[in-house]
C-alpha cells in the first residue's frame, strides 16, 4: 500500500492540475471543472504506477464501462469482465444486456470472463466504440474460463479444483471460486503474451489475496476498530450493495452459519435496490439493526426500518452510531454479527476509532 506521504504527494499534484485546468476554463468562459472522487483517485493511481516504475498495472473500474475513468488508458494487454449484475442502472442501463454493452466498451484485445447469460456474452463479443457520434462495432477475442469445483472450506478459506488442479484461496463465498478461476484463466492468457508467471507465484497470489469488507471474517477488531468480539462470536464485514452481492452474502450465511443466530447491522444507500437487497437478506436474520451510512446518498435508518421490519423474523431496531450498533449486536444473543449493505460503512468505523 502507498504511504500517507505518497498519497499526499500525488493528491497535491492532481489538485494542482485541476486548479490549472480551471484557470484555463475561466479564461475562456468554459464551464466549471469538477472531476469526481473516482477520477481523482484514478489519476493518483496513475502517478503512483509511474513513480514506482511498475511493470504491470491492474486497474479496477469504478462503475465500469464506456465512461469509466480507467477507460482513459488505451494500452491494455488484457481485459477481464467478472459476473455482471444489475448495478449503477441509472448510468449503465436497466437490463443485463444494456449494462454488458457499456462494460464491454472498455475492453481491448483479449477479454477473459466466466459463464454468463447469453445476452451478456453476445455484448462482450461485439463491443462498439462511438466515433463522430456513430457506433463502430468490433469483434472481441473472448475467452470463457472453465467452471471451478468446490472441494472443502471453513472460515479461514476454501480449496477448489480448476482444470484438474487444486488451489486454495483465503476469501469466502462460492462466487470467489469463479473470480479465482477467472484469474487463473487470465494468467494463462498472459503467458501466451510471454509474461513469465510460474505456478508457485500463481498459487501464492491466490492464497494470499484478501478483500476487505467482502465476506471478511474480522480477526483483529480490537486493534483496528476498538470493537470487542466475545468468545465464540463471529463478526463479518460485507460491503455488497446490490441484489447480486446480497445473494452471494445470503448463500454464504446458509453455507457457513447454518443453525446459527444471525444479527444484521444494515445500512444502504438510497439509490440502490434497497427492497431487492432487503428481500434477500432480511429473512435470514434473527435480528436487524438499521443504521444510516455516512453518505449524502444514504437512506435514513427510519426509512430502512420500514422496509426491512416486515421481512425480518425477529426484532428490528435502529442505532445512530455504527460502532455502537456492531458492539451491541456482538454482546447480544446472536452467534454471528454481519455489518453489511454499503462499503461506506467501513470508512466510518476507521475514522471513528
What is each residue range found by the language model?
Residues 1-74, 90-92, 118-119:
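ATP-dependent carboxylate-amine ligase catalytic core
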Residues 63-67, 73-131, 274:
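Conserved catalytic-core segment of NTP-binding enzymes
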Residues 152-165:
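Acidic-glycine-rich active-site phosphate/pyrophosphate-binding loop
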Residues 343-353:
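Glycine/aspartate-rich loop-and-adjacent alpha/beta segment that forms the canonical ThDP
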Residues 54, 76, 107-109, 285, ...:
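Short, well-ordered alpha-helix to beta-strand connector turns
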Amino acid at each position: 500500500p502507498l504511504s500517507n506521504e505518497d498519497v499526499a504527494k500525488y493528491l497535491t499534484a492532481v489538485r494542482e492540475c485541476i486548479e490549472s485546468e480551471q484557470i484555463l476554463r475561466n479564461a475562456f468562459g468554459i464551464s466549471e471543472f469538477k472531476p469526481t472522487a473516482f477520477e481523482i483517485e484514478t489519476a493518483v493511481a496513475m502517478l503512483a504506477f509511474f513513480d514506482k516504475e511498475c511493470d504491470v498495472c491492474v486497474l479496477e473500474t469504478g462503475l465500469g464501462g464506456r465512461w469509466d475513468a480507467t477507460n482513459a488508458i488505451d494500452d491494455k494487454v488484457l481485459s477481464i469482465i467478472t459476473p455482471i449484475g444489475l448495478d449503477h442502472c441509472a448510468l449503465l442501463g436497466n437490463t443485463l444486456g444494456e449494462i454488458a454493452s457499456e462494460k464491454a466498451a472498455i475492453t481491448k484485445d483479449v477479454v477473459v470472463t466466466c459463464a454468463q447469460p447469453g445476452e451478456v456474452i453476445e455484448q462482450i463479443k461485439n463491443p462498439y466504440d462511438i466515433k463522430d457520434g456513430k457506433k463502430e462495432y468490433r469483434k472481441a477475442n473472448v475467452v470463457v474460463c472453465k467452471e471451478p469445483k468446490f472441494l472443502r472450506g471453513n472460515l479461514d478459506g476454501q480449496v477448489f479444483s480448476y482444470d484438474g488442479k487444486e488451489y486454495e484461496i483465503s476469501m469466502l463465498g462460492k462466487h470467489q471460486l469463479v473470480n479465482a478461476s477467472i484469474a487463473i484463466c487470465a494468467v494463462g492468457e498472459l503467458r501466451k503474451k510471454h509474461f513469465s508467471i510460474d505456478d508457485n507465484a500463481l498459487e501464492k497470489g491466490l492464497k494470499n489475496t484478501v478483500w476487505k469488507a467482502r465476506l471478511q471474517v474480522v480477526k483483529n477488531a480490537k486493534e483496528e476498530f476498538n470493537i470487542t468480539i466475545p468468545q465464540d462470536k463471529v463478526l463479518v464485514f460485507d460491503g455488497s450493495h446490490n441484489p447480486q452481492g446480497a445473494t452471494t452474502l445470503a448463500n454464504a450465511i446458509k453455507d457457513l452459519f447454518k443453525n446459527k443466530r444471525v444479527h444484521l447491522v444494515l445500512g444502504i444507500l438510497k439509490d440502490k435496490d434497497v427492497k431487492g437487497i432487503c428481500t434477500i437478506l432480511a429473512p435470514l436474520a434473527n435480528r436487524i439493526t438499521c443504521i444510516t451510512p455516512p453518505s449524502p446518498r444514504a437512506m435514513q435508518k427510519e426509512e430502512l426500518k420500514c422496509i426491512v421490519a416486515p421481512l425480518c423474523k425477529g426484532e428490528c431496531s435502529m442505532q445512530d452510531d455504527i460502532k455502537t450498533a456492531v458492539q451491541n449486536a456482538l454482546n447480544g444473543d446472536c452467534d454471528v454479527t454481519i455489518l453489511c449493505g454499503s462499503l461506506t460503512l467501513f470508512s466510518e468505523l476507521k475514522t471513528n476509532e
